Each structure stands twice: as structure tokens, then as C-alpha cells.
From Swiss-Prot:
Gene Ontology MF, one: glucuronosyltransferase activity
Tissue occurrence: Expressed in roots and shoots.
Chain segments annotated as coiled-coil in the UniProt record: none
Protein name per the record: UDP-glycosyltransferase 85A4
InterPro entries: UDP_glucos_trans (IPR002213), UDP_glycos_trans_CS (IPR035595)
UniProt-listed Enzyme Commission number(s): 2.4.1.-
Binding site for UDP-alpha-D-glucose: 305, 363-365, 380-388, 402-405
Top-rank taxon: Eukaryota
The keyword ATP-binding appears for this protein: no
Family of this protein: Belongs to the UDP-glycosyltransferase family.
């Protein structure tokens, strides 16, 4: 690649590419905005499937971008289906591994052949899009990976190979699964009293060629080649785990929560702050509804972008909320219920019409959680949701669905003291009891005090000039991302 003339060529240009799922897109977009605030030209790359979904949900001009923050797309090989269709995880994984490298490199070369923008000087990639490492090495530019889950999840994933070698996974059969999941694993650094049930749930497979296990090994086997690895966490939350991780991957930097850095550094009324990439249409009425409610009176319910409930489960949640007598705001997105999105019975809707609001789409979760009316969060324990709830000072009721959400549940409820368990099997009586306890009980009060303390520590980590996340972010920006000189190749 040739360096372009003119002052614009001296401006660093970050190519940012998330894994194409909502929970991965959100933190990457925040990271891209933070780089833009530090003077980077940013190209944000979506795959075709999600590019179309964003245009459907946010309108035809949603991806126009700004002169120094542009959106591009690469083909992903996925068929175009209904905009609200649930993405097939295995197809998504297969398509990114097999289809994205060549068009990604072609995009970089095309951008570098123009004269209106500086050449791409670094790649910021989701760790799950590890083909970008090959592109960076070929083009001789640094690549920083973003790990969008917790540091704890990463250290567990890094030991999946050892679980296989010790013949702990895959299971021989699933006949005694419950007993097997109680197996204590005592040989992972910084992990005390952790059981298989607390691992991301791919450990339950009986398939020696399980594609998710293969994908985990594929990703964790490649990340050591990255120039640096960002984790959206902060030192005091996962201190011991981060120390252990750095003995395996010295280039790890805790730089979260991104939400705090974004709030500190980017004006809320700026054009860059307004850029969004939600895959579902976002409603705007919930905040007005919350304005009519008393402080900490409402429980917010959202199971994330990938959770699929059975009709029985959603009915148990519904009647548990009804029986609690509490006001609630519940996101019931399209595709959330297996087979029937309109399963909520008329009796439930009638009984709760004056104290419940249902959102049939998507909402600005950060704004909802930070609203004074929110007193609790019934959540699937996705990592973004966990950090957003922590930052808002809102305690959680934890009902994980899959993957690292089970790990997050364990640490929220047992180690960090910010969550309550609802149990794997959903029963309306249990939902009622836990909601009441969180909103009104002594345990709920203790959790609320603890989460407020964690929020204070998160803010300390993000504060200049000496906060750990602030210093780590500055270190990578200055020593990895902006020190690279484009040379002819």
C-alpha cells in the first residue's frame, strides 16, 4: 500500500468490524465512536445481511454516516430472509469463516486506492471475526481484537481444549447431565469453586465434532496473534482473572465499561453520538411512560436479542409478573417466542393494562435502565446487559439462556452480589416471589447497595488521568494504533 500525500494521510484510519449480532455490534460501535473522538477516521463494516436489517429498522439514510465516520458492507453468503427472522447461529459462524476474508481485504484495498480518505492503518475486529488477523498480517497493519464477553468467559473458553484432553467434554451421553454439571473444576487459574454448570453451556454437548466447540477452539487458538486485545470490563470487577489472563495473553487490556467512556468523551447531542445500528425498529414511548411512574417502582424485563422462549415459559413469566403486583416494562421482540409471538393471553393483558407496558420491538436499554423509575431488571445476563445494569445501579434477576450468560449469572449472584437467581425452570410462583423480594425486600436492598458500589468503581476506572480503563485505552491508541507507518508493499 502506498502512503497518500496531504495531511489527511497522516490521520489514523481504523477499520472496525463487529461480529454480525446485536450484542457484538453495540460495543464495537461505542469503541469506534471513541476512536473517532480521538481523531481517527473510521470505516465501520457490516455484513450484507445486517446492513439490510439496519436499513429496514432505522430507515434508508441510517448508514449515510459522516465524512470521517463511514459505513461499508461486505458479502456474507447468507440468504436474505424476513428482516425479523432469527439468525441461525451455525450458519452465521460458517459464513463468516468461509466467506468474509477475501471481500474484507478487497474493501481495504479499494479504500486505499482512493484519495479522499487516509489509508487504513489499523483493524479493530471482533474476536469472533478472526479472519481479520490474516488480513492484517498480509497487509502489515496492526489488528486489535475486541472481546465482547467478560474476562471470566474468555479464560474459561481458553481452557476448553484442556477439558477435551481430560475427557470432561464431550459428554459420553446425556443421561446423567445434572450430576455431571455439578463437577467442580479446580485447575483453572483464578477460578475458585467453579462448576461445569457455570461454564458457557457448550460443555453439555455429546458430539465430538460439535461445531460450537470447534468454533471456540478456532477463535481461542488465533487470538494470541493479535496486536492487542480489548475487553469491555474493568480491573476491580475481574482483577484476579485479568491477572491470570495476562500470563496467557500479555496483550490484554481492560477498557470498559464503554458506556462510561462514551458518556465522558462524546457530547450527547453530537452527530456521532446519534449514530445507531439496532437490528429491530426502536420504539420511543417507553421513556414517556416511565416519566409517569414513581422512583424505583418499575421492573424492566428484556431477554436480549437471541433468547427464544417456549410458550409455557413466557406464560409463567407473564403470570408471575401479574401476581407480583409490580409495574413492569417488558420488551417482547419479534421472534422471541418459539412459534407464536402473540401468545400472551387477553386475561393477562386486561389484568395488567394499567401497570404494564409491552414493547413489540426494541428500546434504548441504556436510557431505560438509567431512568429513575426503574428499580430492577429481569435479564438473560448478556454481558452488555450486565454492564449496563451495573452502570445504572440497577440490581438484577438472572435467567440465562445460553453461552456465557450462565457464567455471568454465577458471578452476578454469587461473587459480585448484584443479582438474584430465578432458577432454570420457570414457575410463576418463583417469578412472583423473586420480583417482590428484589423490589421490596431486604435482599433487594442489599443488592442495590452493592451494585451502586460497583458503579462507583466502574466510574473510577474510566476517569482520567489515572483510571485503569482510561489508561489502558490511551496506551493501545498511542502505542499500537497510531504509531504504525504505512509503507509501500
Amino acid at each position: 500500500m502506498e502512503q497518500h500525500g496531504g495531511s489527511s494521510s497522516q490521520k489514523p484510519h481504523a477499520m472496525c468490524i463487529p461480529y454480525p449480532a446485536q450484542g457484538h455490534i453495540n460495543p464495537m460501535l461505542k469503541l469506534a465512536k471513541l476512536l473517532h473522538a480521538r481523531g481517527f477516521h473510521v470505516t465501520f463494516v457490516n455484513t450484507d445481511y445486517n446492513h439490510r436489517r439496519i436499513l429496514q429498522s432505522r430507515g434508508p439514510h441510517a448508514l449515510n454516516g459522516l465524512p470521517s465516520f463511514r459505513f461499508e458492507t461486505i458479502p456474507d453468503g447468507l440468504p436474505w430472509t424476513d428482516v425479523d427472522a432469527k439468525q441461525d447461529m451455525l450458519k452465521l459462524i460458517d459464513s463468516t469463516i468461509n466467506n468474509c476474508l477475501a471481500p474484507f481485504k478487497d474493501l481495504i484495498l479499494r479504500l486505499n486506492s482512493g484519495s479522499d480518505i487516509p489509508p487504513v492503518s489499523c483493524i479493530i475486529s471482533d474476536a469472533s471475526m478472526s479472519f481479520t488477523i490474516d488480513a492484517a498480517e498480509e497487509l502489515k497493519i496492526p489488528v486489535v481484537l475486541l472481546w465482547t464477553n467478560s474476562a471470566t468467559a474468555l479464560i474459561l473458553y481458553l481452557h476448553y481444549q484442556k477439558l477435551i484432553e481430560k475427557e470432561i467434554i464431550p459428554l459420553k451421553d446425556s443421561s446423567d447431565l445434572k450430576k455431571h454439571l455439578e463437577t467442580e473444576i479446580d485447575w483453572i487459574p483464578s477460578m475458585k469453586k467453579i462448576k461445569l454448570k457455570d461454564f458457557p453451556d457448550f460443555v453439555t454437548t455429546t458430539n465430538p465434532q460439535d461445531p460450537m466447540i470447534s468454533f471456540i477452539l478456532h477463535v481461542t487458538g488465533r487470538i494470541k496473534r493479535a496486536s492487542a486485545i480489548f475487553i469491555n470490563t474493568f480491573e476491580k470487577l475481574e482483577h484476579n482473572v485479568l491477572l491470570s489472563l495476562r500470563s496467557l495473553l500479555p496483550q490484554i487490556y481492560s477498557v470498559g465499561p464503554f458506556q462510561i467512556l462514551e458518556n465522558r468523551e462524546i457530547d450527547k447531542n453530537s452527530e456521532i453520538r446519534k449514530l445507531g445500528l439496532n437490528l429491530w425498529e426502536e420504539e420511543t414511548e417507553s421513556l414517556d411512560w416511565l416519566d409517569t411512574k414513581a422512583e424505583k417502582a418499575v421492573i424492566y424485563v428484556n431477554f436480549g436479542s437471541l433468547t427464544v422462549l417456549t410458550s409455557e415459559q413466557i406464560l409463567e413469566f407473564a403470570w408471575g409478573l401479574a401476581r407480583s403486583g409490580k409495574e413492569f416494562l417488558w420488551v417482547v421482540r419479534s421472534g422471541m417466542v418459539d412459534g407464536d409471538d402473540s401468545i400472551l393471553p387477553a386475561e393477562f393483558l386486561s389484568e395488567t393494562k394499567n401497570r404494564g407496558m409491552l414493547i413489540k420491538g426494541w428500546c434504548s436499554q441504556e436510557k431505560v435502565l438509567s431512568h429513575p423509575a426503574i428499580g430492577g431488571f429481569l435479564t438473560h445476563c448478556g454481558w452488555n446487559s450486565t454492564l449496563e445494569s451495573l452502570y445504572a445501579g440497577v440490581p438484577m434477576i438472572c435467567w440465562p439462556f445460553f453461552a456465557d450468560q450462565l457464567t455471568n449469572r454465577k458471578f452476578c449472584c454469587e461473587d459480585w452480589g448484584i443479582g438474584m437467581e430465578i432458577g432454570e425452570e420457570v414457575k410463576r410462583e418463583r417469578v412472583e416471589t423473586v420480583v417482590k423480594e428484589l423490589m421490596d425486600g431486604e435482599k433487594g436492598k442489599r443488592l442495590r447497595e452493592k451494585v451502586v458500589e460497583w458503579r462507583r468503581l466502574a466510574e473510577e476506572a474510566s476517569a482520567p488521568p489515572l483510571g485503569s480503563s482510561y489508561v489502558n485505552f490511551e496506551t493501545v491508541v498511542n502505542k499500537v494504533l497510531t504509531c504504525h507507518t504505512i509503507r509501500s508493499t
